[in-house]
Each structure stands twice: as structure tokens, then as C-alpha cells.
Amino acid sequence: MAKGEGHILAQNKKARHDYHIVETVEAGIVLTGTEIKSVRAARIQLKDGFAQIKNGEAWLVNVHIAPFEQGNIWNADPERTRKLLLKKREITHLANELKGTGMTLVPLKVYLKDGFAKVLIGLAKGKHDYDKRETIKRRDQERDIKKQMKHYNAR
């Protein structure tokens, strides 16, 4: 399977609007039993999440996984920091890239791959407001061109 393929459970569509994605990395997530059940039920929010590297380990911060309904006392804190499973070489590469100005790690999507929950992390640089407007303008122009081509080819 190619990188990022699998049953997509959650996507962070706002991330591609707010950031220039330089590169992507697939990482596993350390979850408790009730958390993986909630993730498989697609009860996960990536909107405010980000990843950081501390003491040679990668961590996923501010990602909300809703408590499992039948979890009772086994439910963990929905906003807890979760460890990401990456190779040491990938962590050092990302740590070196993060030293650049304005770089951050953003979760792009969560999906299941061979029964395991994976997160696609993007190394990103923040966009300015004029970049966002330019992206919207370019997307609208492409949509208009496709509409005109479709109308022209229908004749």
C-alpha cells in the first residue's frame, strides 16, 4: 500500500489551507484500548492538533479523541499527549527541519493500515493571509476553467 492509503478516519482539511506542506511522514500512534475503539468509530478531531519533538521522541498534542461510550473507568483523558512511533532517523531529520524558522509538524489525517491506527504528519510552514487568498483565487479560476471546458465539450 502506498503512503497514506487505508481507511481514512479523520482529515485535517484546514491544515492544507493554513500551511505549505513541505513533506509528509507516516507515524504510528500509541493508544489505549478504549482510544483505539473511539478512533475506529471515527470520533477523533485533528483541527487544533500538532506534533512536537521532546527528548528524542515525537508527541502528538491537542488531538481530541472522544471517550468510548462503554469505556467507563478505562477511558483516558480525551486531550492527553500521545506518543508517535517513528524511527530514530526520521525523528532526527524532523528535529533538524524544525530548527528552520516558521516550521511545524501538523497531523494531516488518521487512517487504519493493516489494523493499526496511523497518522500522516506534515512538515509545514505557515502561510500568510495573502497566500491564502491567492490559493482560493487559483482554485476558483481552475474551477471556472473546468466548467467552461465541460460546457465547451458538451456541444
From Swiss-Prot:
Upper classification of the organism: Bacteria, Bacillati, Bacillota, Bacilli, Lactobacillales
Recorded family membership: Belongs to the SmpB family.
Subcellular compartments: Cytoplasm
Designated name of the protein: SsrA-binding protein
Its job: Required for rescue of stalled ribosomes mediated by trans-translation. Binds to transfer-messenger RNA (tmRNA), required for stable association of tmRNA with ribosomes. tmRNA and SmpB together mimic tRNA shape, replacing the anticodon stem-loop with SmpB. tmRNA is encoded by the ssrA gene; the 2 termini fold to resemble tRNA(Ala) and it encodes a 'tag peptide', a short internal open reading frame. During trans-translation Ala-aminoacylated tmRNA acts like a tRNA, entering the A-site of stalled ribosomes, displacing the stalled mRNA.
Keywords: Cytoplasm, RNA-binding
GO biological process, one term: trans-translation
GO cellular component term, pick one: cytosol
InterPro entries: SmpB, SsrA-bd_prot, SsrA-bd_prot_CS
Source organism superkingdom: Bacteria
MF (Gene Ontology): RNA binding
Organism for this UniProt entry: Streptococcus pyogenes serotype M4 (strain MGAS10750)
Keyword Ribosomal protein in record: no
Encoding gene (name): smpB
